């Protein structure tokens, strides 16, 4: 639903400022931890933060003085043209940036970027963007301000719409408007920047010769100022602004991108194409096949044409590519003019910097920056990341009954950086002569290894982005465990230290920090690309709203569903009966009973029950009874209210329920550092093009696409088709009306030199009074699995049939340790069964105890009456939960147990059966000090004297971690309490697929749905991810409390990683699981096992209590043998394995019959709720009957008729 129009009053502003500050006044520690700078360049990019890079009173939404026009009789008057915009979230340091610490010590990243640029054919910055340009150096600016060049740093803060204007030298510095502001208690000067179009009335286009002071467009009475050109600034804008945009839009001429974007800033009414007509394309064999199949796999022909319409299919693909890029650039201009509600972040409002003195604050900031390595790493390691969406493929027109209609799925983005070095063609498919000798890589990705060139391509060939990206990759330590010795970075460095590595970037002194060393350490996690398919895309974004529907049942029984039309009931009263409010009350009730702590629910921490709750077996049984009674009572009351008071259709409502979340398009929500802003922008470009490409076949259908003017004629049509898709289910937008808050416009006096003060004698005219501001992306995930419908296509039916087996609930009994209360049993095992351990081992061992019980191998003489009662209570609870469980997730704490139990009861009331529902898991990133020497190689800051000195040098870094606030590595923890994570307004990485469809009959509007999906790469992306179709994952980095106040998975062969081996051992179970796990890890990792922390063990086994016992084994090795060694650890394993079978029942001895415990009878439903409702549960996979539906009196569902007869009509 579209939001109501909003009116915003904007102050008048120049298009940007050049800030001049004393280097000593910069908070270099804080700035360096958030900046992007390569060690081989003084150029840097900083986040725009109030109190850090701009003054506290800095205003973000402004009306920019964008030009002038003649008014009055005879055109003698001048009125200034005003354009709404907001400031870019990044500042560009072009002079004096050496004071800022380098993001990474990796050498020669500029050289690496330029080499990749040449390989892939993108234009370099080698000369001024315009002819006859005159340099304005940093020293000259300092001299004009009477500042010392040696002690001054200069950086540009510019509005989003006009950053390309600065690059193409269509601006000038107005020294007369220089003002002094206070930043962090120190004085700073800022020079306003205005467009040269002020001197050219009624000109709404770029000045191709801005340095021609005698141009005929310049007013006769005006004193023309020299345009602003600084080669270092233009080089920085060329890298950070233009490079990523050019890669995302597949335009190799970066100056063409700059001119197109600058023209859109000046001409707000332009709707046609702005990219050059000579755009080149990558030569590769385009997919041709049945678009309805959705897989994208089909036969190919060498010329890129398919079996159908072969003469035009290649042309259509290339035309769709450039027209989608053109539309995306046009929409990006609309977003640049948008007015956003979020305030620019202030360094004083960052809780992470208020944790203590300067040292503690920097450590906290360094730890938080390391947290983000999990998200940034996921974007690098995922093969379907937006970073690699570099080409457009053609799936071919649809066959079959729908073949005559245009398809929304014919053209789509593919991840194919490996073909970027192929020969280039023109729009007709002719290979350009200067690229004809380049080797063409096959589109199926065979024989392609990920390299630094691909990473440079993903970064837009910007050394600053690449350096900051390496900053995060150097902290990606908690990844998957491949267990391969040749990947040991220490060994690699020692072996190559004294030899010549064909790297071209480093020498012996800089090799530890070299980008190739980092990539080698992580090479088992680097993405592998296969044949291109129509697949989800991995996106980066930020939750800017604390509201989401990510509870187990999503937006079931929401406010909108319960509110009756024309009902005047108070909204608060309705909200009290929603599923969301009921879950809040349930959690609050459990917190009042001191069973959970709400503060820990969002932290993905163990959330264990307080030890004071359970002190003996009786109290544990009471705890289970209390949990059960509380949840069942809440569920009964909730359903009774829905049916009797609200007349809510509970079954239909469940079928319509979705998990939902919104990713903000506000530029300041992702502005922690330049890389997060860069990832957010790449996401926007990918999403825009995905939507635009869906409309290209509709545009081409029935048209002669070979016509010379087709692109110019139909580009405005494609742009309008995209704008019609706004508020269609995926991208939300709001209409904003803008006015000017100032009575007069402060601007340069055009009749006097630029050194003179400004005047306020001008009137201003707003060029855009009303605009659409794109707000957020709506992501949803259906709660129930749907196995088809009458209107589904054959291809869709085939896909659903393949998924049904994954969703079908298996017919098996409960497993205690992996069941509903397994986490409680493991946590309190020492209290409940103090003798529950193998003979010879003093540590209580729940795995050993319950394995023997469930195998009927536990000697009955070892169990007391109280033990048997406790075992019976645990088994009864587990069996009753298992009988109604349709959530393919295991509770890890009481909060999750309550949510899952409650949801299962609702499912039971709604007569759900047979299939698991879709479950959500949030993987929350964290940080810790590193322990493995291989993880700190990039931070070695002394000369290494030979191969034998590599590990001692790394050990020295580990010993001095306290003096390095940036020396942290990332970790992962998971939680199923996703809504509480989303309440922290996190930055997230998620897989997304966008479906497009028409409305009801007679409605040709295109609606969309942003479907929650997966990231290709599985455990390479994150060790806690699992290939499970019934689960959806989101990687999250919370912001509340830090910087603000309170997928289909991978294609190809999946490696048998150590993580998968360990999960297999855990799933098989056994009395001494930790022994088998420890032995497997020791065999794979060797000496590295001693450096594994609890977080690493959790990443391997996904079980907090098992991880703690595994971590304790390392300490046991030291205790028993004096020091840790592989041999000592192996000896410990042998000793423990010898005791594995000890304690089992001997031949002829009586064994405790676990199956005879109450609750092991054929699966029964939970006890009658409040003595009234009897809902018998059928075995899994069968429909449960409702013979005595006393509570609701709804009766059985109506029988479906086999067909519609004439008599019925």
From Swiss-Prot:
A zinc finger (unnamed) spans 503-516. It is found in: Host nucleus. Plays several crucial roles in viral infection. Participates in the opening of the viral DNA origin to initiate replication by interacting with the origin-binding protein. May disrupt loops, hairpins and other secondary structures present on ssDNA to reduce and eliminate pausing of viral DNA polymerase at specific sites during elongation. Promotes viral DNA recombination by performing strand-transfer, characterized by the ability to transfer a DNA strand from a linear duplex to a complementary single-stranded DNA circle. Can also catalyze the renaturation of complementary single strands. Signal peptide: none annotated. Residues 1182-1209 are annotated as: Required for nuclear localization. It comes from Equine herpesvirus 1 (strain Ab4p). It comes from the Viruses. The lineage of its organism: Viruses, Duplodnaviria, Heunggongvirae, Peploviricota, Herviviricetes. The keyword Zinc applies. Keywords: DNA replication, DNA-binding, Host nucleus, Metal-binding, Zinc, Zinc-finger. Its main location: host cell. One of its GO terms (cellular component) is host cell nucleus. GO terms for biological process: DNA replication. Residues 290-312 are annotated as: Disordered. Homooligomers. Forms double-helical filaments necessary for the formation of replication compartments within the host nucleus. Interacts with the origin-binding protein. Interacts with the helicase primase complex; this interaction stimulates primer synthesis activity of the helicase-primase complex. Interacts with the DNA polymerase. Interacts with the alkaline exonuclease; this interaction increases its nuclease processivity. It holds the Pfam family Viral_DNA_bp. Belongs to the herpesviridae major DNA-binding protein family. This is Major DNA-binding protein.
């Amino acid at each position: 639903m579209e939001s109501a129009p909003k009116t915003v009053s904007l102050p008048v502003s120049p298009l940007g400022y050049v800030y001049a500050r004393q280097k000593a006044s910069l908070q270099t520690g804080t700035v360096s931890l958030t900046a992007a700078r390569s060690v081989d360049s003084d150029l840097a990019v900083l986040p725009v933060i109030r109190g850090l890079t701009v003054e506290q009173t800095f205003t973000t939404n402004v009306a920019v003085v964008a030009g002038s026009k003649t008014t009055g009789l005879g055109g003698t008057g001048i009125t200034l043209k005003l354009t709404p915009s907001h400031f870019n979230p990044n500042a560009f340091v072009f002079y004096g940036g050496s004071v800022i610490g380098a993001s990474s010590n990796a050498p020669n990243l500029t050289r690496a970027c330029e080499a990749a640029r040449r390989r892939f054919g993108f234009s370099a910055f080698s000369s001024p963007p315009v002819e006859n340009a005159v340099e304005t150096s940093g020293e000259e600016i300092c001299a004009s301000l009477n500042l010392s060049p040696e002690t001054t740093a200069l950086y540009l803060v510019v509005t989003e719409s006009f950053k390309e204007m600065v690059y193409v030298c269509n601006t000038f510095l107005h020294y007369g408007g220089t003002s002094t502001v206070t930043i962090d208690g120190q004085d700073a000067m800022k020079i306003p920047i205005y467009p040269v179009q002020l001197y050219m009335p009624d000109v709404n286009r770029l000045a191709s010769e801005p340095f021609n002071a005698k141009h005929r467009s310049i007013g006769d009475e005006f004193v023309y100022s020299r345009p602003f050109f600084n080669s270092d600034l233009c080089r920085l804008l060329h890298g950070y602004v233009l490079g990523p945009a050019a890669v995302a839009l597949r335009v190799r001429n970066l100056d063409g991108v700059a001119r197109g974007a600058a023209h859109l800033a000046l001409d707000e009414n332009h709707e046609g194409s702005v990219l050059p007509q000579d755009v080149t394309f990558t030569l590769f064999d385009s997919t041709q096949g049945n678009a309805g199949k959705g897989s994208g796999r089909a036969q190919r022909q060498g010329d890129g044409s398919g079996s159908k319409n072969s003469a035009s299919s290649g042309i259509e693909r290339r035309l769709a590519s450039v027209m989608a890029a053109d539309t995306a650039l046009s929409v990006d201009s609309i977003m640049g003019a948008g007015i956003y509600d979020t305030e620019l972040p202030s360094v004083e409002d960052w809780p992470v910097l208020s944790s203590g003195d300067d040292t503690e604050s920097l450590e906290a900031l360094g730890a938080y920056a390391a947290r983000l390595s999990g998200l940034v790493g996921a974007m690098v390691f995922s093969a379907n990341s937006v970073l690699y969406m570099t080409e457009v493929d053609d799936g071919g027109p649809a066959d079959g009954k729908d073949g005559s209609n245009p398809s929304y799925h014919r053209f789509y983005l593919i991840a194919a950086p490996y073909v970027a070095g192929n020969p280039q063609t023109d729009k007709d498919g002719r290979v350009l002569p200067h690229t004809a000798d380049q080797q063409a890589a096959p589109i199926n990705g065979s024989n392609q290894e990920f390299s630094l060139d691909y990473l440079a391509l993903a970064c837009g060939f910007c050394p600053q982005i690449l350096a900051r990206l390496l900053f995060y990759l150097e902290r990606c330590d908690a990844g998957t465990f491949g267990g391969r010795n040749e990947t040991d970075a220490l060994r690699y460095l020692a072996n190559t230290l004294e030899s010549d590595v064909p790297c071209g970037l480093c020498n012996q002194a800089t090799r530890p920090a070299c980008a190739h060393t980092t990539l080698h350490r992580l090479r088992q996690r680097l993405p592998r690309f296969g044949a291109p398919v129509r697949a989800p895309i991995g996106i980066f974004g930020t939750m800017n709203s604390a509201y989401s529907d990510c509870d187990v049942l999503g937006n079931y029984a929401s406010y909108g569903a319960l509110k009756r039309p024309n009902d005047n009931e108070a909204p608060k009263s309705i909200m009290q009966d929603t599923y969301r409010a009921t879950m809040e009350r349930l959690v609050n009730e459990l917190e009042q009973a001191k069973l959970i702590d709400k503060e820990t629910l969002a932290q993905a921490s163990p959330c264990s029950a307080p030890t004071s709750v359970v002190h003996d077996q009786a109290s544990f049984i009471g705890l289970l009874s209390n949990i059960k009674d509380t949840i069942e009572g809440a569920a009964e009351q909730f359903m009774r209210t829905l049916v009797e008071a609200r007349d809510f259709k509970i079954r239909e409502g469940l079928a319509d329920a979705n998990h939902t979340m919104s990713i903000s398009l506000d530029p300041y929500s992702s502005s922690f550092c330049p890389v997060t802003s860069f990832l957010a922008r790449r996401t926007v470009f990918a999403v825009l093009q995905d939507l635009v490409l869906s409309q290209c076949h509709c545009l081409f259908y029935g048209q002669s696409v070979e016509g010379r003017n087709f692109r110019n004629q139909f580009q405005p049509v494609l742009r309008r088709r995209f704008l019609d898709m706004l508020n269609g289910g995926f991208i939300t937008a709001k209409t904003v009306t803008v006015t000017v808050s100032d009575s007069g416009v402060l601007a340069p006096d055009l009749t006097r030199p630029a050194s003179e003060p400004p005047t306020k004698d001008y009137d201003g005219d707003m060029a855009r009074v009303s605009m659409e501001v794109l707000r957020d992306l709506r992501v949803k995930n259906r709660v129930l699995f749907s196995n088809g419908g009458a209107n589904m296509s054959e291809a869709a039916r085939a896909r659903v049939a393949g998924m049904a087996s994954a969703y079908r609930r298996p017919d098996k009994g409960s497993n205690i340790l992996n069941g509903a209360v397994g986490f409680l049993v493991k946590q309190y095992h020492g209290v409940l069964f103090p003798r529950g351990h193998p003979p010879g081992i003093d540590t209580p061992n729940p795995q050993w105890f319950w394995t023997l019980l469930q195998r009927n191998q536990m000697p009955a003489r070892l169990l007391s009456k109280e033990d048997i009662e406790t075992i019976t209570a645990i088994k009864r609870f587990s069996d009753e939960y298992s009988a109604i469980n349709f959530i393919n997730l295991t509770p890890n704490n009481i909060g999750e147990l309550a949510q899952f139990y409650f949801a299962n009861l609702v499912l039971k009331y709604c007569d759900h059966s047979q299939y698991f529902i879709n479950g959500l898991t949030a993987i929350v990133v964290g940080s810790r000090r590193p322990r493995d020497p291989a993880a700190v190689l990039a931070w070695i800051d002394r000369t290494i004297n030979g191969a034998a000195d590599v590990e001692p040098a790394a050990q020295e870094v580990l010993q001095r971690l306290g003096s390095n606030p940036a020396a942290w590595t990332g970790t992962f923890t998971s939680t199923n309490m996703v809504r509480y994570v989303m309440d922290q307004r996190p930055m997230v990485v998620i897989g997304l697929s966008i479906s497009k469809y028409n409305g009801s009959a007679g409605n040709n509007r295109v609606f969309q749905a942003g479907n929650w999906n997966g990231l290709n790469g599985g455990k390479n992306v994150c060790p806690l991810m699992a290939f499970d179709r019934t689960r959806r994952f989101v990687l999250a980095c919370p912001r509340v409390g830090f910087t603000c106040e309170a997928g289909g998975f991978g294609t190809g062969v999946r490696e048998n990683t150590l993580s998968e081996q360990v999960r297999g051992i855990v799933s098989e179970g056994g009395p001494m699981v930790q022994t088998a796990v420890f032995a497997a890890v020791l065999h794979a990792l060797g000496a590295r096992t001693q450096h594994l922390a609890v977080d690493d063990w959790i990443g391997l086994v996904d079980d907090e209590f098992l991880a703690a016992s595994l971590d304790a084994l390392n300490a046991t090795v030291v205790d028993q043998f004096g020091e840790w060694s592989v041999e000592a650890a192996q000896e410990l394993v042998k000793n423990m394995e010898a005791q594995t079978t000890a304690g089992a029942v001997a031949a002829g001895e009586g064994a405790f019959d676990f199956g005879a415990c109450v609750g092991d009878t054929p699966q029964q439903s939970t006890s009658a709720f409040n003595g009234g409702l009897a809902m018998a549960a059928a075995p899994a996979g069968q429909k449960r009957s409702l013979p005595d539906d006393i509570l609701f009196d709804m009766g059985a569902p109506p029988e479906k008729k086999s067909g519609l007869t004439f008599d019925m009509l």
